[in-house]
A protein has these predicted regions:
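A domain-level signal for the mature, folded cores of soluble proteins
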Residues: 11, 36, 58-60, 67-290, ...
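Fungal intrinsically disordered, low-complexity serine/threonine- and proline-rich regulatory regions
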Residues: 3-59, 63-65, 73
């Protein structure tokens, strides 16, 4: 085992991407009952202090259906919330956009997104890396090797039975977005964003670049739902003439294996969803965002699994491997409906914020085996280099170095889809990517504070208290980037 230090560098790799074009894949899923949509208005200069560029907003088509978002318009609702939080019932205490003009027809959109060529499949994108395994030296083969024990102890995930937003493929996600510098489209780079050229956006604005949905997310475009990626958990099925094994999802997981000091190897299993549906307080939903990265970390010591860390909003829990429920010898985890926060048990998971009590919910829904469809990599902490592994040698690496957000920027107060209360927003900014999930962590916990390893599973309904300080804590950054603000995963 190599002796590797716990530090990071920028680790930029040469950019020689082939000329690729995007493909548009579509999915369908059962939408919830329709509710009235909100009007929208163009952001004002006061709503975007970090850019002085012209604001352009993508307009949705009229064919999409409205989404299921409760509209906080009645005075009774404001009174109930004010009473609940001990605040004035004056609506002036709330930040809520006035109803403005309805969305214009697509023909009147401020910009037109050109149709992307549909010449490559998602699988072809994932095999578009330019590494040649036949040229690997013995040392490089070792550097790219995934230990068999990592796969032997790969986690299972029970998705929620009533989930509306299933796992998604980041290659497909890129076909539905326009990169923006804050709220301004990056015209010269808006087309053909692929897994092999995404890092080029770092030259424009770094963390101020947002992969912004081409659609109005309140109308629930099908690609957000990912229903074609629901894993089959009863027997095997035939898909396009080929057998699809039990537990396999069409949405690939991303495995990043990180060797560390003293025989430690961390195996990060990353899961991507195109949409995060926030939780409710008194039937008001907070924390929606486009793009959602979650992960399970299995830590090994000298080849044996010793601990498991589960991502859960911005904090998460860590367990001794012996404490986790298993199928055979593999850990069993549970993904919460909407938020996709990871838990070790099924049931209700309340957590107490300054705003009030929110709940995640998990159950034994479709069983997902991420190891059946994954793209795997090794990550070197000394030079920050991500390498496609011996299992998926053609997997591209450029996307990993993208430093911006995988979703829209938090909508401004002038956008009628947005509202806030007690510092919490209905829509928040999309998350940073897998690179920024503290891959170099010394202990197994996600955050930088005290790391508590549980040797038992919590009882159902055990509440977790989250302090304002924890909410402000920046925990999903790597040591090779500056401190970040506006992190709301």
């Amino acid at each position: 085992m190599p002796e590797l230090a716990h530090f990071h560098t920028n680790g930029q790799l040469p950019l020689n991407p082939p000329s690729l074009v995007s493909t548009s894949l579509t999915t369908s899923y059962n939408r919830p009952p329709s509710y009235p949509t909100y009007a929208s208005s163009t952001p004002t200069a006061n709503d975007q202090p970090d850019t002085d560029q012209v604001v352009v907003q993508i307009q949705p088509t009229s064919s999409s259906k409205p989404c299921h978002v409760p509209k906080p318009s009645s005075s009774g609702l404001f009174s109930r919330l004010a009473e609940y939080f001990g605040l004035s019932s004056d609506k002036g205490a709330w930040s809520r956009a006035k109803q403005g003009d309805q969305y214009k027809d697509q023909a009147e959109a401020l910009i037109e997104i050109d149709s992307l060529s549909e010449t490559m499949s998602s699988a072809e994108y994932w095999n578009s890396g330019n590494s040649d395994p036949s040229s690997w030296s013995i040392e490089e083969q070792d550097a790219r090797s995934i230990p068999q024990y990592v796969l032997d102890y790969a986690p299972y995930v029970h998705l929620f039975s009533g989930e509306e937003f299933w796992p998604c493929d980041i290659a497909e996600h890129l076909t539905h977005i326009t990169p923006k510098l804050n709220y301004t489209p990056i015209y010269k780079m808006r087309r053909d964003r692929t897994l092999n050229n995404l890092e080029e956006l770092n030259r424009v604005g770094g963390r101020s670049v947002y992969l912004t949905s081409n659609d109005n997310v309140e109308e629930r475009p099908d690609w957000l739902g990912g229903s074609s990626n629901i894993p089959e958990d009863v027997g095997s099925v035939m898909t396009n003439g080929t057998e699809r094994p039990v537990g396999r999802s069409s949405a690939p997981a991303v495995l990043v294996v990180v060797p560390k000091e003293d025989g430690i190897v961390d195996a990060f299993w990353f899961y991507f969803y195109s949409y995060n549906l926030g939780n409710k307080v008194l039937n008001i939903r907070f924390g929606n965002h486009v793009g959602d990265w979650e992960h399970t970390l299995v830590r090994f010591k000298d080849g044996a699994p010793v601990q498991v860390s589960l991502s859960e909003h911005s904090w998460g829990e860590a367990y001794a491997y012996s404490a986790i429920e298993k199928i055979g010898k593999r850990p069993l985890t549970f993904s919460a409906t909407g938020s996709h926060a990871m838990y070790a048990t099924p049931g209700l998971h309340p957590y107490v914020l300054p705003l009030g009590v929110l709940h995640d919910q998990t159950d034994r829904g479709p069983l997902w085996d991420p190891s059946l469809n994954m793209h795997s990599y090794t990550y070197n902490l000394q030079n920050g280099a991500l390498l496609a592994s011996n299992h998926t040698p053609q997997a591209p690496t450029n996307w990993f170095y993208f430093g911006g957000r995988w979703g829209d920027k938090s909508y401004p107060s002038s956008d009628s889809r947005q509202y806030s209360f007690a510092g919490q927003y209905h829509y928040v900014s999309g998350p940073l990517g897998a690179r920024f999930k503290n891959l170099g962590r010394a202990n197994v916990c996600q955050g930088g504070g005290k790391c508590e390893i549980r040797y038992w599973l919590p009882p159902p309904g055990m509440a977790k208290h989250i302090s304002p300080e924890q909410l402000q804590e920046t925990v999903d950054t790597d040591l090779d980037v500056d401190s970040l603000t506006d992190i709301k995963d």
